[in-house]
A protein has these predicted regions:
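Membrane-embedded segments
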Residues: 76-190
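A structural motif corresponding to the C-terminal end of an alpha-helix
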Residues: 117-123, 297-313, 341-351
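Residue-level recognition of beta-strand->loop/alpha-helix junctions
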Residues: 129-131, 316, 352-354
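The substrate-binding groove and active-site-proximal loops of carbohydrate-active enzymes
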Residues: 282-292, 326, 367-374
Length: 396
């Protein structure tokens, strides 16, 4: 018996030591450094303005708390003074151009700068950035359905970014599944599934994933309780794990495991770029299931906005002239035809900013010119253009 206990203690000690060693050494940071050019990596700005009153600050990872906070503040704002802008990471990232240097002050992206200009001009509008990296139009539809079951969140204007890459994205990310905690929203999504539209399967998969996660959590809770007939006692393994996690969470090294995961993902991306030659600048075409599903999502977005009195505004996102995303001229023509048709059918406004940012203002990062992200001056330029052209109706 003593020998068995000693083995258990020794196994736990060795496991803890191995975990501690990995966290302390952080092997993926060292592997990542093999591929990184420090001068280029510094171009990615980490100090950005964060304002939960105007931004979904989790960038799609945990939006429920953000939207509940927005709802409480927007209930005192009339619908015609509310607008939401949605898009990919271009809307919340700054990648410095070669001529730009880091600054101590937090940088602002074009949605922030646009809102500042509007209110400085007396527009008296309340804007909100509802964006996520690599967002799909299925996710934009997912968000819109949530907004529509909360009257205080319904915007008077919905500003949607067109981006060539977005038409290639699919699915609803795990972080957005928590919106299904809202029974009214869950009911609406179930109705969308029954529509048999091309995006319906994506929504069904999201529901299945959410229900599987909830069932697993409930199963873990149930399995942690030992029902002996005398009393319900917590299982020893569960108690030990809980106490160990609580103790470890007090250690700064263990709390940094989220950063370690991010470094692992960065390493995998850099390995893909450097070893396989697959980069964001790799030219691609549109087609197949992703295009069909995204188109059907945008059609549904247009229909819902029209039905609910929401003014839809589309804008074609800037592209880097030094790193075009189109594989052929036919790809560009196809894309232009798609967005023009959608804008004519559903848009109360359409603005084309594809060629609005000159090459020298774009970011350069790790593997060369970035096709989507740009620097500080470019964000100011785009915000000025959006203001001057009246993208937000409050400006007019």
């Amino acid at each position: 018996m003593k020998h068995s206990k000693l083995q258990t203690v020794l196994a736990l000690a060795l496991t803890f030591a191995a975990l501690w060693g990995l966290l302390a050494w952080d092997p993926f940071r060292h592997l990542r450094d093999i591929f990184v050019n420090p001068a280029l990596e510094n171009a990615k700005v980490s100090s950005l303005l964060t304002d939960p009153n105007t931004q979904e600050v989790s960038d799609g990872q945990k939006p429920l708390e953000s939207l509940r906070k927005l709802e409480s503040s927007w209930c005192n704002v009339s619908k015609d003074r509310r607008y939401i802008l949605t898009g990919n990471s271009q809307t919340f990232s700054v990648l410095l151009a070669p001529s730009e240097a880091p600054q101590a002050e937090a940088d602002r992206t074009y949605p922030d700068l646009l809102l500042d200009r509007l209110n400085a001009a007396g527009a008296n509008v309340h804007g909100y950035r509802l964006s996520a990296p690599n967002i799909s139009y299925m996710e934009v539809l997912w968000y819109l359905n949530y907004l529509l079951v909360h009257p205080c969140l319904i915007p008077g204007e919905f500003v949607i970014q067109f981006n060539f890459e977005t038409f290639r994205k699919t699915g609803v990310r795990e972080g957005m599944l928590e919106l299904l905690e809202d029974p009214d929203f869950a009911s609406i999504i179930e109705q969308e599934v029954r529509s048999n539209a091309p995006y319906a399967n994506t929504f069904q998969q999201a529901i299945d994933q959410y229900e599987s996660r909830i069932a697993k959590e409930k199963g873990n809770q149930a399995s942690s309780i030992s029902k002996t007939g005398f009393a319900e006692a917590r299982g020893a393994g569960n108690v030990l794990e809980t106490k160990a996690r609580t103790a470890l969470d007090h250690l700064s090294l263990f709390r940094s495991r989220g950063e370690w995961k991010a470094e692992l993902l960065d390493f995998l991306y850099l390995a893909r770029v450097n070893l396989l030659g697959i980069t964001p600048t790799t030219k691609r075409s549109l087609g197949g299931g992703p295009l069909t599903t995204n188109l059907s999502s945008l059609e549904r977005i247009g229909e819902l906005c029209r039905r609910n009195g929401i003014r839809v505004v589309f804008f074609n996102a800037p592209q880097n002239p030094n790193a075009p995303l189109y594989r052929t001229s036919a790809d560009r023509e196809q894309y232009q035809q798609i967005i023009s048709r959608l804008a004519r059918k559903f848009g109360q406004g359409y603005f084309d900013f594809e060629n609005s940012i000159p090459g020298p203002l774009w970011g350069v990062w790790i593997d060369g010119p970035d096709p989507i992200h740009f620097g500080r001056a470019a964000h100011r330029r785009l915000a000025d253009l959006m203001f001057e052209q009246g993208v937000i109706s409050g400006k007019k």
